[in-house]
């Protein structure tokens, strides 16, 4: 989880290794309380919003027609979407780690 990073920073991090299925989760810049799952695929970055309901469950906006699923934790959500054909552009393959403080300041 990358916390509060800009969309641009997110895109830079995902584009660095250029691997289809690279992903990260960050806070949404324009929807308070929402998170964004960002995935690199075929030279583009796809963003899916993650919302938390009043009971604390996570749900993600996927492709139209895909049933809504609830997840107890972000880890459960990621585990599910690591499998192919779950409603995202591609399955989650390579988590992009948070840069260390020394790397961010360069």
Task: Show the residue positions of the predicted features.
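Domain-scale recognition of modular recruitment/scaffold domains used in eukaryotic signaling
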Residues: 1-106
């Amino acid at each position: 989880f990358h916390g509060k990073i800009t969309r641009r920073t997110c895109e830079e991090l995902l584009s660095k290794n250029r691997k289809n299925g690279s992903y990260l989760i960050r806070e949404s810049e324009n929807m308070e309380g929402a998170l964004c799952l960002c995935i690199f695929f075929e030279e583009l970055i796809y963003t899916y919003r993650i919302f938390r309901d009043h009971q604390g469950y996570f749900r993600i906006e996927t492709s139209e027609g895909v049933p809504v699923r609830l997840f107890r934790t972000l880890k459960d959500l990621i585990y599910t979407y690591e499998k192919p054909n779950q409603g995202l552009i591609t399955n989650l393959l390579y988590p992009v780690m948070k840069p260390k403080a020394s790397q961010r300041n360069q």
